[in-house]
Design a protein with these regions (language model features):
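Extended, structured, electrostatic nucleic-acid-contact surfaces
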Residues: 1-20
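Acidic beta-strand-to-loop metal/phosphate-binding motif
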Residues: 85-90, 140-152
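Short Gly/Thr/Asp-enriched flexible loops that form oxyanion-binding sites at enzyme active sites
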Residues: 152-167
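Conserved phosphate-handling catalytic cores of large alpha/beta enzymes
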Residues: 168-178, 182-204
Length: 204
C-alpha cells in the first residue's frame, strides 16, 4: 500500500502524538497547522523546545524549576519569604497554582512525584531526605503537605508525616483543607478553591 502522507509529516505527527493528552487526530491537526503556518513559527517552536534542557534546571534546595543561570530559586532566596514554613508539593507546576492564590508566603519543596508502587515509585525516589535536612537547617516550624488529593497523594502525605515523627522532629504538620475534590491535581484547582484550602488547612 502506498504511503498516504509525506514521511516528514508522518514523523512530525508521530512525535507530537507522544505528548501527554494528545491523540492521533489531534497530532495530525497540530502537525498540519505547523505545515501551513509561517516557517518562522515552526523554527521558534523548535528553538524553544531545544532550549528546555539547556536553559532550565532544578533548584538544588527546593527542586523548583529555575533558569540555568540561577543558583537557587528566588522563592527561596527572597528575604521576604518565610523560611520557617514549607509547602511540600509533588511537582514544580504545583508551585504556580499555590502562588496564584497570593495567600502563601513561605517556601516550597518539590518531592518530584508521589509514592505509587504500581508505577514503581517508592519513597526513596522522592526528595524526602533533602526535605528533612531543610527542616533541621532552616529550623522550620510548619510543614504544609500540599500533595494532590489522590490515593498516591494521600499515601505520600501519610508517609511524610510518619517519617518526620519517627525522625524525632517536633514540628507542626498540616494538610490542605478538603476544598480540593478527590482526584483533582493541584495545578488544575481554581484559585478560590486553593485559597480556601490554604486558609482551612488542618493539623495532620
Amino acid at each position: 500500500m502506498s504511503q498516504l502522507l509525506p514521511s516528514a509529516l508522518t514523523e512530525a505527527i508521530d512525535e507530537i502524538g507522544r505528548l501527554p493528552g494528545v491523540g492521533a487526530r489531534t497530532a495530525e491537526r497540530y502537525a498540519y497547522f505547523l505545515l501551513r503556518a509561517d516557517k518562522h513559527l515552526s523554527e521558534k517552536l523548535a528553538s524553544a523546545i531545544t532550549k528546555l534542557h539547556s536553559g532550565v534546571k532544578s533548584c538544588p534546595i527546593t527542586f523548583a524549576l529555575i533558569d540555568s543561570s540561577e543558583e537557587v530559586s528566588s522563592l527561596y532566596s527572597d528575604p521576604s519569604r518565610d523560611k520557617k514554613t514549607i509547602a511540600v508539593v509533588e511537582e514544580p507546576l504545583d508551585i504556580i497554582a499555590l502562588e496564584r492564590t497570593g495567600q502563601f508566603h513561605g517556601t516550597y519543596h518539590v518531592l518530584g512525584g508521589a509514592i505509587s508502587p504500581i508505577d514503581g515509585i517508592g519513597p526513596e525516589q522522592l526528595h524526602i531526605p533533602e526535605l528533612i535536612d531543610r527542616i533541621k537547617k532552616d529550623e522550620v516550624e510548619e510543614i504544609i503537605i500540599a500533595t494532590n488529593a489522590s490515593v498516591e497523594g494521600e499515601s505520600t502525605a501519610i508517609f511524610l508525616q510518619k517519617h518526620i515523627i519517627d525522625d524525632g522532629i517536633k514540628i507542626k504538620i498540616t494538610r490542605l483543607a478538603r476544598g480540593i475534590p478527590v482526584g483533582v491535581d493541584l495545578e488544575y484547582a481554581s484559585q478560590i478553591t486553593l485559597t480556601h484550602a490554604l486558609d482551612g488547612r488542618r493539623a495532620f
